[in-house]
């Protein structure tokens, strides 16, 4: 929180205590945290079907677990990020930061204990083992999530958001996602978290984005931003 018109005195006191603790013991705290985190990351590299992801430049405190090309043991259907998110929460009482089509993001901090990280690691291995029992390793077997792209393509900007709002007077209508391709949006569309828009007012909706949104809906994700579920408001004559 950088600024607020309604400051929380509990939060402010907590921030003061955090500053004091880091000033007095910061080096010690982060040294211990780094050891725990490095150990956890090394152990998670042993997952067989789920994978701990990393890039050239990454924040090591965030554990990104990919479930791409895995299937659920009971249904033989694709096992997606939302299912891993719900599994961790409902069965293991572990709260992930967010879920997407292919992955979940798990936040860690110096406040996490060795016992807490051990709970997480054990839960992930237990889930992975269940998948393993029903999913033998096969190099030629691809189980991609149809319609989901890890990076969304940019839409064609037709109007600015302000101009799109001004165009409302010329007529609007609501269409189902199946009929949205090529139409100019008047609403934001996004998944939360992370809250990054898939569609912005004034953009022409692409076929790939429609496919992506329908795939997310099929996996049980809530599409935010639109007034009516399963529909989006568009310009009537565009």
Segments (PLM) and residue ranges:
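Solvent-exposed, flexible loop/coil residues
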Residues: 6, 209, 227
């Amino acid at each position: 929180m950088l600024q607020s018109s309604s400051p929380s005195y509990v939060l402010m006191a907590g921030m003061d205590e955090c500053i004091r603790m880091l000033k007095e013991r910061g080096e010690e705290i982060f040294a211990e945290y780094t050891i725990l985190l490095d150990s956890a990351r090394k152990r998670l590299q042993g997952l067989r079907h789920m994978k701990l992801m990393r890039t050239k430049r990454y924040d090591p405190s965030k554990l990104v677990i990919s479930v791409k090309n895995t299937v659920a043991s009971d249904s033989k259907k694709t096992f997606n990020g939302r299912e891993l998110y719900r599994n961790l929460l409902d069965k293991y009482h572990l709260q992930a930061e967010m879920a997407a089509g292919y992955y979940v993001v798990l936040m860690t901090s110096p406040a996490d204990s060795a016992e807490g990280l051990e709970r997480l690691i054990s839960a992930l291995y237990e889930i992975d083992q269940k998948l393993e029992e029903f999913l033998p390793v096969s190099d030629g077997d691809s189980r991609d999530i149809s319609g989901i792209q890890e990076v969304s393509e940019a839409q064609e900007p037709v109007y600015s958001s302000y101009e799109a709002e001004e165009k409302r007077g010329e007529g609007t209508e609501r269409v189902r996602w199946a009929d949205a391709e090529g139409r100019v949006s008047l609403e934001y569309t996004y998944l939360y978290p992370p809250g990054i828009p898939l569609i912005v007012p004034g953009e022409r909706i692409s076929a790939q984005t429609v496919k992506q949104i329908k795939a997310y809906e099929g996996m049980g994700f809530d599409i935010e931003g639109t007034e009516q579920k399963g529909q989006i408001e568009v310009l009537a004559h565009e």
